Amino acid sequence: MPKLPRGLRFGADNEILNDFQELWFPDLFIESSDTHPWYTLKGRVLNAHLDDRLPNVGGRQVRRTPHRVTVPIASSGLRPVTTVQYDPAALSFLLNARVDWDFGNGDSANLVINDFLFRTFAPKEFDFSNSLVPRYTQAFSAFNAKYGTMIGEGLETIKYLGLLLRRLREGYRAVKRGDLRALRRVIQSYHNGKWKPATAGNLWLEFRYGLMPLFYDIRDVMLDWQNRHDKIQRLLRFSVGHGEDYVVEFDNLYPAVAYFKLKGEITLERRHRHGISYANREGYAVFDNGSLRPVSDWKELATAFINPHEVAWELTPYSFVVDWFLNVGDILAQQGQLYHNIDIVDGFDRRDIRLKSFTIKGERNGRPVNVSASLSAVDLFYSRLHTSNLPFATLDLDTTFSSFKHVLDSIFLLTQRVKR
């Protein structure tokens, strides 16, 4: 019997099958061969001509998976996800540069550097699951609308609809009578039988947390009605990703012995993507420790449909402000809502790092020199793990506060508190 490539095995009837133990849990090996052992330095410095071939830094260490082969799975026609890891001890970059200066009195140079290798810290420890979870929660939710929250906020919604109708009526009357001053009531609030003048802050907060949520609720209910008879395909793929920049600094690079030094920053993008292949089943499901399981009885179905913990949180005053910094709402939504019932056939969790941009400077004896350079990556981090679970949200503090809308919200909320 012939020997099969790594990743395959013979079945009971000598058919060729995937060896999932080898594909999903492979043994890693260490790759230590230096890919760029030399760099060249050519040009003129201090009236001396250089044409040197110099050794690059050694000691390369990369933990990686071996190459394996797969065949399509008979039941689905898809090739299985394989675990792939390329885990360098340090990130490696290749620099090509031209450096020149002229400080007078013979202190000048014009040098060309090719294939100069240097290494930096590898920021491999990252997990952006909290950014992926809301999109999974929304994609596999049994309903677009949050009916529990809509029921909990029903009284406030009715009051707000009454205010909108009152405004429309007053606007119609003002136009009919030709009383343009009375048109101001279209944007004013009404309390205890009196109209109160509007402020920019009140209008903004009403738009953000009154009018827009109302429109979204109406849209979601209409989508649920339109999709009530949809037939979902037998097998689907779904994936979401998130990336964030990370800056690594480097200093004290001396490609030309002690003539000058280089320093700068490298902007890396750390990316996290999670994906699944899944089959749809009849009925509904709930979240259970990273996976979805069918509901067990009508009580569990009703509880997940309402999601009382999320409703209680949504009805808590200023809970939306807390959600700017702590992902409480995302956690309650993921763990308590009602889902479509699916079977996860295959899946992956991938993290990698890619080179995005760089800046570089040179100096000689504290004085800047001219540097034009290009940079390419040699060893970057890559990890793709097989998984059959969904990403899991954990409590996380976010202090970036990068949303301009949240900045405006904060200003107007503080203004309201000060006025009180």
UniProtKB/Swiss-Prot annotation:
Changing residue 219 to G: In strain: Qbeta_1. GO terms for biological process: adhesion receptor-mediated virion attachment to host cell; symbiont-mediated suppression of host cell wall biogenesis; symbiont-mediated suppression of host peptidoglycan biosynthetic process; viral release from host cell by cytolysis; viral release via suppression of host peptidoglycan biosynthetic process; virion attachment to host cell pilus. It is found in: Virion. Changing residue 219 to K: In strain: TW18. Changing residue 76 to L: In strain: Qbeta_2. Its main location: virion. Changing residue 254 to C: In strain: Qbeta_3. Changing residue 189 to F: In strain: Qbeta_3. GO terms for cellular component: virion component. InterPro entries: A_protein. Changing residue 100 to G: In strain: Qbeta_2. Residues 158-176, 226-236, 294-298 are annotated as: RNA-binding. Keywords: Cytolysis, Host cell lysis by virus, Host-virus interaction, Viral attachment to host adhesion receptor, Viral attachment to host cell, Viral attachment to host cell pilus, Viral release from host cell, Virion, Virus entry into host cell. It holds the Pfam family Phage_mat-A. Interacts with host MurA; this interaction inhibits the first step in host cell wall synthesis. Interacts with the capsid protein. Belongs to the Leviviricetes maturation protein family. This is Maturation protein A2. It comes from Escherichia virus Qbeta. The lineage of its organism: Viruses, Riboviria, Orthornavirae, Lenarviricota, Leviviricetes.
